[in-house]
Amino acid sequence: MYYSPWDCEAYAKNPKYTRPLIQCEYNHTMGNSGGNLKEYWDLIRKYPKFQGGYDWDFVDQGLHRHPDFKANRTVADYDAIAAKYEPGTGNMAPEYTYGGDYNKIDASDNNFNCNGIIGPDRQLNPHAYELAYQYQNIWAEPVDLKAGKISVYNENFFRDLSNYKLVWTLLQDGKAVQNGEVADLNVAPQQRVTLTLPYQVPATGEVMLNVDFQLKDAEPLMTKGQTVAYRQLAVREQTAPAACCAM
């Protein structure tokens, strides 16, 4: 586990190793992590022998509490005629706790319980978006972007792309200037097709092409129109002015 990308590539290229490489852990999603997932998945897609790994871990294991919070309550002594109401006090802001937050001695490895793809409140952490991007099974690649040509690769092994549509947007200096869609994607599993999108490249500025693959009909856990894969391609990159001559 936790082979580096270059160790994984060395294993995949070595003919002495005939068994597939599947890491029992390889992506410790602690803090703002996951920045080298692309390096791993470029190799996974390049070498059939390298077949992936298990992310550590799914969800942060922190516990939800309000620090210094005293709840509303009623109190009474045995001799009291009536109960007394005491309003709650303290900080109402929530926090997520772990390990030594409940003991004088921290028996855990500090904040190692907070290392999930999603947070204790089940909200997505930043690396969840990177993980979803690298795991997507539909890819748009440039062919001749000035002429509107891209290729669409269906990475699925058992299903075609009949339930997806391609939605494209052309941006000039960050602003959408043209858009359209391809309603029918006739791409078989593990196959690639070339499409020509009917846009005109603006004469000036940075030009980017956003490509989204959206569901035509709902599927389990996913809604109609949901984007399940996407790509941004540079039609023309931004050009900086030439540096001034030395003084």
List each model region and its residues:
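Surface-exposed beta-strand edges and their flanking turn/coil or helix-capping segments
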Residues: A12-P15, N36-L37, D68, K165-V167, ...
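Beta-strand-rich N-terminal accessory domains
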Residues: N156, N210, L215, T239-M247
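Intrinsically disordered, low-complexity Pro/Gly/Ser/Thr-rich segments with frequent PxxP/GP/PP motifs
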Residues: K165-Q214, A218-L221
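Short beta-strand elements
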Residues: A218-C244
